[in-house]
């Protein structure tokens, strides 16, 4: 039983050593790929640009590409007042007449509906009496 534990422990340490060696090799290859002709290329951790100014420009560019927002059309210039016909101002009496007409229309519609209901009830009562006789 103890022999199996020792074997397992030996396997685990071998795996750890192999993993560490792989990591060392990987780090060495990354370092060599970052340098070219003696110049070292600096990479940001997040993959973004190093400048704050270019970062702002980059964010604006991305924002425009993703959602341009509402596109507003340019308003056409209005013609001069001389060529336009001036609207006449309405008298106060004319506006009151229009309001009265509008109100009387609604009042007439309400009155007409009640009148129609009364007529139908009277006619239905007459028809019932005629059928009973």
From Swiss-Prot:
It is a single-pass membrane protein. A motif (Bipartite nuclear localization signal) lies at residues 69-75. Induction: By pheromone. Expression is controlled by the STE12 transcription factor that binds to pheromone-response cis-elements (PREs) in the promoter of target genes. Residues 36-100 are annotated as: Disordered. It is found in: Nucleus outer membrane; Cytoplasm, Cytoskeleton, Microtubule organizing center, Spindle pole body. Residues 1-104 are nuclear. Changing residue 115 to R: In pmr3-5; leads to mislocalization and decreases nuclear fusion efficiency. Residues 90-100 have a biased composition (Basic and acidic residues). The chain crosses the membrane at residues 105-127. Coiled coil: none annotated. GO terms for cellular component: cytoplasm; nuclear envelope; nuclear outer membrane; nuclear periphery; spindle pole body. Keywords: Cytoplasm, Cytoskeleton, Membrane, Nucleus, Transmembrane, Transmembrane helix. It comes from the Eukaryota. GO terms for biological process: karyogamy involved in conjugation with cellular fusion; nuclear membrane fusion involved in karyogamy. Residues 128-133 are perinuclear space. Required for the fusion of nuclear envelopes during mating, ensuring proper karyogamy. Plays a role in the initiation of outer nuclear envelope fusion. Interacts with KAR5. This is Pheromone-regulated membrane protein 3. It comes from Saccharomyces cerevisiae (strain ATCC 204508 / S288c) (Baker's yeast).
